[in-house]
Amino acid sequence: MLISGTAFLRLRTNRKAFPTP
């Protein structure tokens, strides 16, 4: 899904706000 891919990239960029496991 494009949404998931975009969100994933944004999450990686904002690791401070949303630290992924």
UniProtKB/Swiss-Prot annotation:
A Pfam entry, by short name: Ery_res_leader1
Keywords: Antibiotic resistance, Leader peptide, Plasmid
GO-annotated biological processes: response to antibiotic
Function: Involved in erythromycin resistance.
Protein name: 23S rRNA methylase leader peptide
Originating organism: Corynebacterium diphtheriae
